[in-house]
């Protein structure tokens, strides 16, 4: 389920958050799925329960999970929608910055369109561009 890289510069609680979000976006974890308790997950990934609790609190604040007192913690019904909307907002901001950078570098909009089509074709074809 979740794999922590102790050598990573990313804090463990952020690794938990990111991986939970990825599992939801990929459809591996679905709305209504029950999560391990804080102590259970801490034992599984060999982390401090306070670290797992911090991740769960942030995921709950973002609307990805919900805790039902006495019943456990579950993936919220709106988790995927919330995550997709967040991703789209992030992509739009990145695109905006890219267009600004391209403008100052003298790259014409038509050239950007051409590159987008090329890269899109590569992605759809399963090719990787390094």
Curated annotation (Swiss-Prot):
Gene name of this polypeptide: ytrA
Coiled-coil residue windows: none
Protein name: HTH-type transcriptional repressor YtrA
Functional note: Negatively regulates ABC transporter complex ytrBCDEF that plays a role in acetoin utilization during stationary phase and sporulation.
GO molecular function: DNA binding; DNA-binding transcription factor activity
InterPro entries noted in UniProt: Tscrpt_reg_HTH_GntR (IPR000524), WH-like_DNA-bd_sf (IPR036388), WH_DNA-bd_sf (IPR036390)
Keywords, sorted A to Z: DNA-binding, Repressor, Transcription, Transcription regulation
Residue range(s) of DNA binding per entry: 38-57
Location of the HTH gntR-type domain: 10-78
């Amino acid at each position: 389920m979740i794999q922590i890289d102790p050598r990573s510069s990313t804090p463990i609680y952020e690794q938990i958050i990111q991986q939970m979000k990825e599992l939801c976006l990929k459809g591996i974890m679905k709305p209504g799925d029950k999560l391990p308790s804080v102590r259970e997950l801490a034992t599984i990934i060999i982390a401090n329960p306070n670290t797992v609790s911090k991740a769960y609190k942030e995921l709950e604040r973002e609307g990805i999970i919900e805790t039902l007192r006495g019943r456990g913690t579950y993936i919220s019904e709106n988790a995927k929608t919330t995550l997709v909307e967040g991703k789209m907002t992030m992509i739009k901001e990145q695109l905006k910055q890219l267009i600004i950078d391209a403008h100052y570098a003298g790259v014409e909009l038509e050239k950007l369109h051409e590159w987008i089509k090329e890269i899109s074709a590569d992605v759809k074809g399963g090719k990787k561009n390094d």
